[in-house]
Amino acid sequence: MDRLHTSSADWPDHLATQVVRVRGGVLQAAGQSDHVAEETPVALEFNGISHATMLVTPTHLDDFALGFALTEGIVGGMADVRGVELETRCDGIVVQVEIATSCEVRLKERRRAMAGRTGCGLCGVETLPEVVRDVAPAADSDALPVHNVLRAMQSLRSRQTLHDATGATHAAGWADASGEVVLAREDVGRHNALDKLIGALARQGIAPLPGMAVVSSRASFEMVQKTASAGIPILAAVSAPTALAIRLARQTNVTLLGFVRNTDATIYSHPQRIAA
């Protein structure tokens, strides 16, 4: 990637606001403050073409744009990305991504007009084939001890600084084979957090094997689709998966775990990757 101009530090990820609290059914005195997460309209443009508008926590927007481009199949890898630039406007932020001209056919195929709901990855998709698109199966990988998966989820919790401040964000983390989370991203939208993580992995040249993705949310169909698109073999979620997510995980050779909490977990697909 030749060019990367970002200044996400210009946009706060949370702010303080005046509140009136109720405690034990009793109104408390006015004048107290609370920290709340920011969400900002972020428009993604590829080669000058407006593609999608999302509500996003305004941090790591370069990673978000890269991860979105990768998991949506707009680009095949970082070699297809020429540069990323961020522009602040009065009504939000525009992320301009320059991609190889050879990717423009895929861009037109995946073009969607998305707006409105936080982390709504499927808003604006017009046909079912656009939703259930072909994704290459994840590569086979060695089994990881279940203890390392549990450790990874516990490690992710310690990386959720924005959630600690606001209680409003999801996190997605990348853990190595030992279960240590080496990279994490947060966002008000769970899909956005995962896109940020995948973009960061690609930008930093971190291979998806061996290791796992851990998320502080449920595992929806699109979370599995993004995981498989990135070649990540294991997805561990703190909450439940959906039936469609399980079917896709089985189809794409992704090991899907849900209810990963403390010393417990449920494995829904490809349990051969999890060892005692």
From Swiss-Prot:
Any single Gene Ontology cellular-component annotation: cytoplasm
- Where does this protein come from, organism-wise? Bordetella parapertussis (strain 12822 / ATCC BAA-587 / NCTC 13253)
Determine if Acetylation is one of this entry's keywords: no
| Main function | Required for formate dehydrogenase (FDH) activity. Acts as a sulfur carrier protein that transfers sulfur from IscS to the molybdenum cofactor prior to its insertion into FDH.
Q: Where is the active site?
A: 120 (cysteine persulfide intermediate)
Location comes to: Cytoplasm
Indicate what this protein is called per its UniProt record. Sulfur carrier protein FdhD
According to the UniProt entry, its GO molecular function terms are: sulfur carrier activity; sulfurtransferase activity
Family stated for the protein in its record: Belongs to the FdhD family.
Q: Which InterPro entries match?
A: Cytidine_deaminase-like (IPR016193), FdhD (IPR003786)
**Phylogenetic classification of the source organism:** Bacteria, Pseudomonadati, Pseudomonadota, Betaproteobacteria, Burkholderiales
Q: Which UniProt keywords apply?
A: Cytoplasm, Molybdenum cofactor biosynthesis
Top-level taxon? Bacteria
* GO biological process: one example: Mo-molybdopterin cofactor biosynthetic process
